[in-house]
Curated annotation (Swiss-Prot):
Its main location: nucleus. Residues 449-462, 556-565, 611-623, 665-690, 699-713 have a biased composition (Polar residues). Interacts with the MLH1-PMS2 heterodimer via MLH1. Interacts with MSH3. Interacts with the MSH2-MSH6 heterodimer via MSH2, and this interaction may increase the processivity of the 5'->3' exonuclease activity. Interacts with PCNA, and this interaction may both stimulate the cryptic 3'->5' exonuclease activity and suppress the 5'->3' exonuclease activity. Interacts with WRN, and this interaction stimulates both the 5'->3' exonuclease activity and cleavage of 5'-overhanging flap structures. Interacts with RECQL/RECQ1, and this interaction stimulates cleavage of 5'-overhanging flap structures. Mg(2+) 2 binds at residues 171, 173, 225. It is an enzyme of class 3 (hydrolase). The modification N6-acetyllysine is found at residue 480. The modification Phosphothreonine is found at residue 612. This is Exonuclease 1. The keyword Nucleotide-binding does not apply. The gene is Exo1.
Length: 837
């Protein structure tokens, strides 16, 4: 169908266009193209003979689209079979029939997809199907016309006569018929390709020498529906022949086609005859004139043309019969009457197709083509209004000031602002966004004293040691602990971001000067104050009279300070600080015994140890010092305890215990714990590390003065530099952190004990200089290390009052609730069972 490859050959003359371009104008539509597309969707039903009208809806979709754009569509349908195409139509009919039979056979075999393809190729659009579309289009007021023979010639006639301004089709033969404007491949949105006859000269292959006649010759030579082409001749070679030939006689040119193309081609006489008939069919095919309502040739006959010899281009019938065929009232094959539509008695109803269209208003070209006063073009109305435009006076050279007050121009709506309420002052407005604590502070400052200063004056009697508070600190806090933490942060200059502080993951600088939680316990039947000042202080506040605890006098204080080397005398300023700390920690409730007897517990302090001696802890311990002197114990027991302390000091990384220890120990144990607890106090700063920071736990666990002397023997072998900072984070295991200036201690190997615990050697020395390792005399030799490494053959003889060493009891780390000798006392059998069983 059509001329193969014509659209690509003339693509320079085509341009994309939307059908809205023809708004207010009339376009003719080759409806059979829409019918073929719509029938493919229901090809299976049509092949089976089942009733369907999906193709009608498909065609009406395009019709409604054109009406929505303001374009008047005129639907054109094919009529009778043209005598020139009988051979072509017969071959097409046979091909459709074979596809139908093949599809039915495939459907029986169960090959549905292949059968559907065969059904799509076997579609035959009948006049009954076209009549359904005609009725549906008439219901919308759309004009329909059935061509006497082919719709292509009828479309070309309407376009050339000016009844329609463009033609919508899928067939390229319309260009050979001489159509002015053709819209090809239009989609459901109105987009397509427009080929204008006036732009055919833009094609480089055609050139300027081509005319409408030569273009038609080229289409016939390349092959069309009316004549098959010669073997090996297409559009390109046909165009070349017509460009080279200067002879106006086309018959002579066809005979010499082999000469022009330099090919061995023999042109038969039948081809020349067929060429002449095809050319006459393109020129003189019969069409119907809807305005005159009669059959007319596409082009007027020439002087040398006999109409009686052009029967292959269509046979004449009566005008009345042709009118009934054009209206669709008669069948094109049998000429039977199938409808009685009359455009004169049944005028088309005027219907609006857009919101902007007014009732009774008819745009140009919307009247029916069956009316005698049909105005096909817009130029008719524009010409009638032309004289009125000339009557208006010319404004050329005139100057006038134009005012726009009377014009209804689009402008922004006036937005009225609500009046400002002047009753509310700026101070009142700012006070709404200020906190209540700030107002309280302002009131306090107006009296001459700030709340923070008054509070601090109560807690700190000495102005020299009073802590400085920030002016922006609110006076009212949720609890005392929050106030204390905030004051410590302000003193240390730490930057606190709300919601981002973590008590577990932080640096040591962020938790300076923090006070630990109080800890107390009541193991078994009595409460004993332990080595830490915090535990002693809080235990005294909670139960001061338990088991005969009494404050000590000044002599006891002097004795305590004399027992601990490196401690200075207690000043009243330090006592003031201790009293302040005790008041702040007094509000905290001690945890129960079950809480203390757990694997994890809060550590003592987060406060940074200073290098200056602080006697505040000794002052605190004065009131808990026993007046009676502790009795001496066996030297063997003290040695064992000392060994245990040394072992534990190594296992814990030479760090002090975070929790206090409770137990049923002797008075000598309490005396030694309270005297040595000054080094690990969480409320005060530790003394200068004369006694060694790593030996603090050992001193706390000594049973008598002999244990204290054993611990003092190790003092010369350790560095006395004060660089060790210990920050105890609550809930985490304690780790020993040393100052960057301190050196690493060397722990030489000693003979191992039977229980598997190692004992510290008394000859272990600390390097006092960074270049000590390079001095030959002070270097440790491998031979000496091997001498020290070994096992003792003779086990120690234990006194009868003690039980033999146990690999289970001696290897476990003592809990904070128990002391060393709790396992050696017969009255503490219950505690042993509770711990080990």
């Amino acid at each position: 169908m059509g001329i193969q490859g014509l659209l690509q050959f003339i693509q320079e003359a085509s341009e994309p266009v939307n059908v809205k371009k023809y708004k207010g104008q009339a376009v003719a539509v080759d409806t059979y193209c829409w019918l073929h597309k719509g029938a493919i969707a229901c090809a299976e039903k049509l092949a089976k003979g089942e009733p369907t009208d999906r193709y009608v809806g498909f065609c009406m979709k395009f019709v409604n689209m054109l009406l929505s754009y303001g374009v008047k569509p005129i639907l054109i349908f094919d009529g009778c079979t043209l005598p020139s195409k009988k051979e072509v139509e017969r071959s097409r009919r046979e091909r459709r029939q074979s596809n139908l039979l093949k599809g039915k056979q495939l459907l029986r075999e169960g090959k549905v997809s292949e059968a559907r393809d065969c059904f799509a190729r076997s579609i035959n659009i009948t006049h009954a199907m076209a009549h359904k579309v005609i009725k549906a289009a008439r219901a919308l007021g759309v004009d329909c016309l059935v061509a006497p023979y082919e719709a292509d010639a009828q479309l070309a006639y309407l376009n050339k006569a000016g009844i329609v301004q463009a033609v919508i089709t899928e067939d390229s033969d319309l260009l050979a018929f001489g159509c002015k404007k053709v819209i090809l491949k239009m989609d459901q949105f109105g987009n397509g390709l427009e080929v204008d006859q006036a732009r055919l000269g833009m094609c480089k292959q055609l050139g300027d020498v081509f005319t409408e006649e030569k273009f038609r010759y080229m289409c016939i030579l390349s092959g069309c529906d009316y004549l098959a082409s010669l073997r090996g001749i297409g559009l390109a070679k046909a165009c070349k022949v017509l460009r080279l030939a200067n002879n106006p006689d086309i018959v002579k040119v066809i005979k010499k086609i082999g000469h022009y193309l330099r090919m061995n081609i023999t042109v038969p006489e039948d081809y020349i005859t067929g060429f002449i008939r095809a050319n006459n069919t393109f020129l003189y095919q019969l069409v119907f004139d809807p305005i005159q309502r009669k059959l007319v040739p596409l082009n007027a006959y020439g002087d040398d043309v006999n109409p009686e010899t052009l029967t292959y281009a269509g046979q004449y019938v009566g005008d009345s019969v042709a009118l009934q065929i054009a209206l669709g009232n008669r069948d094109v094959n049998t000429f039977e009457q199938i409808d009685d539509y009359s455009p004169d008695t049944m005028p088309a109803h005027s219907r609006s197709h857009s919101w902007n269209e007014k009732a009774g208003q008819k745009p140009p070209g919307t009247n029916s083509i069956w009316h005698k006063n049909y105005c096909p073009r817009l130029e008719v109305n524009s010409v009638s209004h032309a004289p009125q435009l000339k009557e208006k006076p010319s404004t050329l050279g005139l100057k006038q000031v134009i005012s726009t007050k009377g014009l209804n121009l689009p402008r922004k709506s006036c937005v009225l602002k609500r009046p400002r309420n002047e009753a509310l002052a700026e101070d009142d407005l700012l006070s709404q966004y200020s906190s209540v604590s700030k107002k309280i502070k302002e009131n306090g400052c107006g009296d001459g004293t700030s709340p923070n200063s008054s509070k601090m004056s109560k807690s700190c009697p000495d102005s020299g040691t009073a802590h400085k508070t920030d002016a922006h600190t609110p006076s009212k806090m949720r609890n005392k602990f929050a106030t204390f933490l905030q004051r410590r942060n302000e003193e240390s200059g730490a930057v606190v971001v709300p919601g981002t502080r973590s008590r577990f993951f932080c640096s040591s600088q962020d938790f300076d000067n923090f006070i630990p939680k109080k800890e107390s316990g009541q193991p078994l039947n009595e409460t004993v104050a332990t080595g830490k000042a915090t535990t002693s202080l809080l235990g005294a506040l909670d139960c001061p009279d338990t088991e005969g605890h009494k404050p000590v006098d000044a002599n006891g204080t002097h004795n305590l300070s004399s027992q601990i080397p490196g401690n200075a005398a207690v000043s009243p300023e330090d006592e003031a600080q201790s009293s302040e700390t005790s008041k702040l920690l007094g509000a905290m409730s001690p945890p129960s015994l079950g809480t203390l007897r757990s694997c994890f517990s809060w550590s003592g302090t987060l406060r940074e140890f200073s290098r200056t001696p602080s006697p505040s802890a000794s002052t605190t311990l004065q009131q808990f010092r026993r007046k009676s002197d502790p009795p001496a114990c066996l030297p063997e027991a003290s040695a064992v305890v000392t060994d245990r302390c040394d072992s534990k000091s190594e296992m814990l990384g030479e760090t002090s215990q975070p929790l206090h220890e409770l137990g049923c120990s002797s008075r000598s144990q309490e005396s030694m714990d309270s005297s040595c607890g000054l080094n690990t106090s969480s409320l005060s700063q530790p003394s200068s590390r004369d006694s060694g920071s790593e030996e603090s736990d050992c001193n706390n666990k000594s049973l008598d003065n002999q244990g204290e002397q054993n611990s003092k023997q190790h003092l010369p072998h350790f560095s006395k530099k004060d660089g060790l900072r210990r920050n105890k984070v609550p809930g985490l295991c304690r780790s020993s952190s040393m100052d960057s200036f301190s050196t690493t201690k060397i722990k030489p190997l000693v003979p191992a004990r039977v229980s598997g615990l190692s004992k510290k050697s008394g000859s272990m020395q600390t390097r006092k200089h960074h270049d000590v390792e390079n001095k030959p005399g002070l270097q440790t030799k491998i031979s000496e290390l091997w001498k020290n490494f070994g096992f003792k053959k003779d086990s120690e003889k234990l006194p009868s009052c003690k039980k033999p060493l146990s690999p289970v009891k001696d290897n476990i780390q003592l809990t904070p609730e128990t002391e060393d000798e709790i396992f050696n006392k017969p009255e503490c059998v219950r505690a042993q069972r509770a711990i080990f069983h």
